[in-house]
Amino acid sequence: MLLERLGKELLYFDGGMGTLLQSKGLQPGELPEVWNLEHAEEIIDIHKAYFEAGSDIVLSNTFGANAIKFHDSKYGLKEIVTAGIQNAKKAAERGVHDGRKTYVALDVGPTGKLLKPMGDLSFEDAYDAFKETMIYGEQAGADLIHIETMSDSYEVKAAVLAAKENTSLPVFATMIFDEKGKLLTGGDVPAVVTMLEGLRVDALGINCGMGPEQMLPILEDILKYASVPIIVKPNAGLPKQRDGEVYYDVEPEQFAGYMAKIVEMGAHVIGGCCGTTPAHIQKMVETTREMSVKPATKKDITMVSSYGHAVILGGKPMIIGERINPTGKKKFKQALKDHDMDYILKEGITQQDKGAHILDVNVGLPDIDEPAMMKELIMALQIVSSLPLQIDTVDITAMEAAMRIYNGKPMVNSVNGKQENMDAVFPLIKRYGGVVIGLTIDEDGIPATADGRVRVAGKIIEEAKKYGIDKKDIVIDVLAMTISSEPEGAKVTLEALKKVREIYGVCTVLGVSNISFGLPYRPAVNSNFYTMAMQNGLSAGIINPSSEDMMRSYYSFCALMNYDKNCEEYIRVYGSQKAGTPAPAAKAELTLKEAIEKGLKEEAHHATGELLKKQAPLEIINEHLIPALDTVGKGFEKGTVFLPQLLMSADAAKIAFAVIKDVLAQEGGEVQAKNKVILATVKGDIHDIGKNIVKVLLENYSFDVIDLGKDVPPEVIVDTAVEQDIRLVGLSALMTTTVVSMEETIKLLRERKPECKVMVGGAVLNQDYADMIGADFYGKDAMQSVYYAQRVFGEE
């Protein structure tokens, strides 16, 4: 019933829960979900008020109910979730009197932990934590699952899979973006939409973090890419304080006006988040009830994504880097056998630097545990590179293992026209999402004619439809056959390429260098064939981006066909190169600064050792290490460096520091730690992702961080500050209900150690609110904490 209404009529969620619970007596540090059992009538009253205000869907009070947060609670997770669903259902019975159909959604929030490789929580452990909640929610009678306030695309993938694989309920998912349209972990709107649609959520969107006005540009971006119905749940503006109470500055009537604009733009499910009340929802419903909803429109865009950004195929030709593949590469084979990850990662980084848009990943080698190696390499590559990856394997087990842990929507290389192969691959594409390469080969082999290959392409496309896989998620490879053995091979390939684009309207890909096997001076043949293929409709070429011949063909073609506006890219690459001058050779080794910027730990270790032969340890720190960290930090602020890369660079810097410290210890010296800083997540809040990121960065700038952990009472923070004579304290809070604890901590610090400075951060905070609670500094991102610490200790 819900899915029949979704996208065809406007549906209404409820509003905020936390601030209403505070008004009813929820104390700082008290878990809101426990009220499902200890104050059930209060919870039922809140739900009832939302139903009476016009909500079609009410969220259970289970935002933080997962196995990680409730592992040592006095109540079992099943008790909490069951009570949460039952309370909402009782409220529907009491609060809905007009006969309309209403729904109870199992509300699922983040775990509060950062997933590996950035944090310490494994993907499968996150999945298991969500899985329990999902199962209990369905058993208790939930009508749908709403995953919300997610700031990490990897965590939301774990949650969506847990819901899809363990329940039969509809799944909604909403993310929390910043004002730049980015997740905490760096993902942008196209990347998030691409991944969530690949995972087949029933609706997606945005919630929390900002008011309705600030959400308008993000919604506009979502509308460009989303084919499924869209959810929008803003806060009631910005948090303020009045007479010691927190309130939000967008009143119900103003909120309703913005929500009408949001419906006009194309939202299908609307509601409220922090600070919104039944009054906000009632006014929103009254204002928009007669508005017609725009139907969700299918977007025929072929997109793949990493955690950070999406790549669109079908317009400007894309480059798929081919070098992470052992075929014909002795050093690469040895690196796989020796588990030399830095060598392999360096191949990926080099291709990214040379202009690749997607990286092919193939680890097929005898005596290698391919599924395990593929998983490890995929995770490692996604830290050092923000490019989407192409999972290249004929091993179905390895393919599934990689697709499951991949953070984004990958390209998958490949499926072919053999029924057995399609039966194995298409279920994985349906389950995990991906753009799959279809090879035009079937039980009869590779057709000799263009029409034969077009026929196999059609067979693959039709079979995919049976699994609900749209043709936008299929890229056809008509196969480049070597002309040394098949003289008509190039002509047949180019003809098939053109026909596939014209007849089926799908994107295409080729392993370009296959055309020249067995010939002398292969780059000449490859580069000319590459140009011909692009002219005939090639969407993406699997090539070596380090080949000057291939890249010259690529940049020239893009400039000539006006894919490169004003020839800007061509001029950037070749503007300083004189005719007839060969391109500079690639360096064999990276400098320490380069190794840190690229997050290569072994390279950083080696480069530090080499520098120590000619420079003093402290000179290396000041002239190489700190400038490298500054470069990465500035890139993070600008959005050109993503959180995984920031943390990987920090790890590489740690390795370099360790080498330097060892040398100093042998010489009887030491690296003097800088001043001490306390970090803590305040009482009642167990979300410490942001705090942990700040800790890593401060330590890399040699600050001595005292990490008091999470759910820390004000007295503990202040006692430590006094005992240790601390000059700077950093406080973190994610939830509206715990910002009160932050204010209490600051007040106590002002009483007992007034000279101590306080910096605050968290999703529910902003500069105005930081000022109101008495903080000295608001950190909108992790790097800001470093700059402020430097200012406090006079290091700027």
PLM feature segments, named:
Residues 1-475, 481-796:
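Domain-level signal for soluble alpha/beta catalytic cores
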